[in-house]
């Protein structure tokens, strides 16, 4: 996995840094694990925009990913490492000994031909999934469950991981990708290693068109809008007149938006590191 730099033959190529896709071993996805994906353009069932800056982009099919890793005791062979347009990580196609095929997130270092196991008796090797109770302290993990059996929810993006810091009674202490220290039940599953494609954060699209191919539309600054459109709009020339805030009037800098008295507060030992 590396990044490709180009000769500046056009303005769009000058600063472009994109993956070389050297880890991809198969270009066609497994048809049995595909489902149609309808475009929403950031709209809800009323047709109102609920997520800004979305729309257009290349047509996609959704790849069904196994986040639960609940097929215990049956070895699986890594058949291919593939590109997934719906996420930043690469995905790996597993073929289990009984013939079943499943996609998982491809961790760093996983290669075609490797054997993977799920369950409490699996070895501590990259790609294997175990309950936190069976993972040694200090291990780097990803695709971590919050609720046993629900499937991994934490550390699923390219290059992310959490670290198992301690185990005490029913809970394991994890250092999250954000730096937050949080308790998670030891019966929750996690996968050994960090998510692959770790150079994703260094990518440079180079031109607006590449963002449009991804379905990302332009972001307009509030200060350039009219007062009807944004709290920071209006005025003569470039005039703020307000503290930086969202289109709905919520302060944008330093204001805590987490709901107070959340039940999960008791599981957070230390808040994430501040910017």
From Swiss-Prot:
Pfam families for this protein: Ribosomal_L2, Ribosomal_L2_C
Segments passing through the bilayer: none
Alphabetized SUPFAM superfamilies for the sequence: Nucleic acid-binding proteins, Translation proteins SH3-like domain
Matches recorded under InterPro entries: NA-bd_OB-fold, Rib_uL2_dom2, Ribosomal_uL2, Ribosomal_uL2_bac/org-type, Ribosomal_uL2_C, Ribosomal_uL2_dom3, Ribosomal_uL2_RNA-bd_dom, Translation_prot_SH3-like_sf
SMART domains on file: Ribosomal_L2, Ribosomal_L2_C
Keywords for this protein: Ribonucleoprotein, Ribosomal protein, RNA-binding, rRNA-binding
One GO cellular component, as annotated: large ribosomal subunit
PANTHER family reported for this sequence: LARGE RIBOSOMAL SUBUNIT PROTEIN UL2M (PTHR13691:SF5), RIBOSOMAL PROTEIN L2 (PTHR13691)
Similarity annotation: Belongs to the universal ribosomal protein uL2 family.
Binding partners and assembly: Part of the 50S ribosomal subunit. Forms a bridge to the 30S subunit in the 70S ribosome.
Function: One of the primary rRNA binding proteins. Required for association of the 30S and 50S subunits to form the 70S ribosome, for tRNA binding and peptide bond formation. It has been suggested to have peptidyltransferase activity; this is somewhat controversial. Makes several contacts with the 16S rRNA in the 70S ribosome.
HAMAP family: Ribosomal_uL2_B
Record-given protein name: Large ribosomal subunit protein uL2
Organism: Kosmotoga olearia (strain ATCC BAA-1733 / DSM 21960 / TBF 19.5.1)
């Amino acid at each position: 996995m590396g990044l490709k730099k180009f000769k500046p033959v056009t303005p769009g190529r000058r600063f472009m840094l994109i993956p070389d896709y050297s880890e991809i071993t198969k270009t066609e996805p497994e048809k049995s694990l595909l489902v149609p994906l309808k475009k929403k353009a950031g709209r809800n069932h009323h047709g109102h925009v609920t997520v800004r800056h979305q729309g257009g982009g290349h047509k996609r099919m959704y790849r069904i990913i196994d986040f639960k890793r609940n097929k215990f005791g049956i070895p699986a062979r890594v058949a291919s490492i593939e590109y997934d347009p719906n996420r930043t990580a690469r995905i790996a196609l597993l073929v289990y000994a009984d013939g079943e095929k499943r996609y998982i997130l491809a961790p760093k270092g996983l290669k075609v031909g490797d054997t993977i196991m799920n369950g409490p008796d699996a070895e501590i090797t990259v790609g294997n999934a175990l309950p936190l109770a069976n993972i040694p302290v200090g291990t780097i993990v990803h695709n971590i469950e919050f609720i046993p059996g629900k499937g991994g929810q934490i550390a699923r993006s390219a290059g992310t991981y959490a670290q198992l810091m301690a185990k005490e009674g029913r809970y394991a202490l994890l250092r999250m990708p954000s730096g937050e220290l949080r308790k998670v039940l030891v019966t929750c599953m996690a996968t050994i290693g960090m998510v692959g494609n770790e150079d994703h954060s260094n990518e440079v699209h180079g031109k607006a068109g590449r963002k449009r191919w991804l379905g990302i539309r332009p972001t307009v600054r509030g200060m350039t809008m009219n007062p009807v459109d944004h709290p920071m709009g209006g005025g003569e020339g470039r005039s703020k007149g307000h503290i930086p805030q969202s289109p709905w009037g919520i302060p944008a800098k330093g204001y805590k938006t987490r709901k107070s008295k959340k039940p999960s507060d008791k599981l957070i030992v230390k808040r994430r590191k501040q910017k």
